[in-house]
């Protein structure tokens, strides 16, 4: 007979994705996300990855506000929304983080900007770097890579390598930032595969 402690541990280790569902609100934005992703990334855009990112950011609530001030479906901070709109005025125009169409265009555009600045040993690892940067800033990713390399770790691998190194974040920010790519790529991406491709299928069972 299992002790309560062991039973609790085994229960905690069960795949959390079994209870995950796509929110009802997501369907109304599906077509807009697909169109925006194809426009920026082409027909091979990882739709499931983008959808999982929105799921993690706002659970598809266009009016979402975080305690620290992030706004809309893609949870842009005001300064980041203004910056990305200024960087791509033709594609994005005036920043409108609470406008679902603008938020989804801005998310896939910012992800592309980050993707172009992050190399990795696999596509899954590359997206983990991208998502870490989306959550905490590219500067932190660069510093974490340098620290990992100086410590003898592979700076081109995120999982079980760079993700272990903290170049100076607070404990809370570090924990949030490390959970962010894993939740999106290893937990939520798979529930959106009916929408399109993901990038981390080889790691779903790890």
Please describe what each predicted stretch is.
Residues 3, 46, 165-167:
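N-terminal hydrophobic alpha-helix used for membrane targeting or insertion
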Residues 2-12:
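Bacterial N-terminal signal peptides
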Residues 13-32, 41, 82-109, 113-206:
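Non-catalytic cell-wall polysaccharide-engagement segments
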Residues 55-80, 137, 184:
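Cell-wall polysaccharide-cleaving catalytic domain and substrate-binding groove, primarily
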Residues 45-50, 55, 68-71, 127:
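Extracytoplasmic
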Residues 52, 75, 130-132:
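Soluble periplasmic/extracytoplasmic beta-strand elements of cell-envelope proteins
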Residues 38:
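A Zn2+-metalloprotease active-site environment signal
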């Amino acid at each position: 007979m299992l002790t309560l402690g062991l039973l609790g541990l085994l229960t905690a280790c069960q795949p959390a994705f079994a209870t995950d569902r796509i929110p009802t609100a997501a369907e109304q934005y599906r077509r807009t996300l697909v169109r925006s992703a194809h426009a920026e990334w082409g027909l091979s855009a990882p739709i499931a990855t983008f959808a999982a990112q929105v799921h993690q950011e706002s659970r598809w609530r266009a009016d979402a506000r975080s305690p620290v001030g992030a706004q809309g479906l893609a949870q842009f901070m005001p300064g980041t929304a203004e910056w990305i709109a200024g960087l791509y005025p033709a594609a994005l125009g005036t920043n409108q983080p609470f406008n679902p169409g603008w938020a989804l265009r801005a998310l896939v555009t910012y992800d592309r900007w980050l993707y172009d600045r992050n190399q990795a040993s696999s596509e899954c690892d590359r997206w983990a770097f991208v998502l870490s940067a989306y959550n905490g800033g590219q500067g932190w990713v660069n510093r974490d890579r340098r620290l990992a390399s100086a410590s003898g770790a592979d700076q081109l691998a995120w999982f079980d390598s760079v993700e272990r190194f903290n170049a100076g974040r607070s404990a809370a920010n570090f924990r949030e930032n490390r959970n962010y790519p894993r939740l999106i790529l290893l937990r939520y991406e798979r529930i959106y595969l009916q929408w399109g491709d993901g990038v981390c299928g080889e790691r779903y069972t790890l």
